Amino acid sequence: VTTETAQKESLGKALGRIASGVFLVSFTKDGKKDGMLSTFVMQGGFDAPVVVVAVNNKRPLLDVLKPGDTFVVNVMSKANMDVYKSFAKPFQEGMDRYEGIALKGGTEHPVLANGVSYMTCKVLSYAPATDHQLLIAEAIDGEQLTEEEPMIHLRKNGFGY
């Protein structure tokens, strides 16, 4: 094992210990509900409240959500494992990832009925971050829906999901 390899392994383990939540970033475009799982979400400001989502450069979401568009960040708990399993599967054409998942009515974008909370966000901008883009958005609405504890995600290796 080379010194460089050992350093990368050590750094990977350290990065993997950065605890994060598990989130469903959801949106509706041209009448079609879509979304993606994310563990790279954080609050980035207070006044106005800012939410930052790191999005892999290969994700189609980057072609869909433009400045001014809105989307939802759903905070998930262990009670949302059905959602996790549905969105963790590879996408197949015609697939409805929301099939069988309870959604809150009266919202523009999919909101998990039994999620911990949700925030409706408006895209402000993107900033490059090597293999990801930082989606910077203002939280414009939101609600706590349950008293469940948010799901916590730790990784064995910080160089992968």
Can you annotate each of these PLM segments?
Residues 1-161:
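Basic, polyanion-binding surface patches
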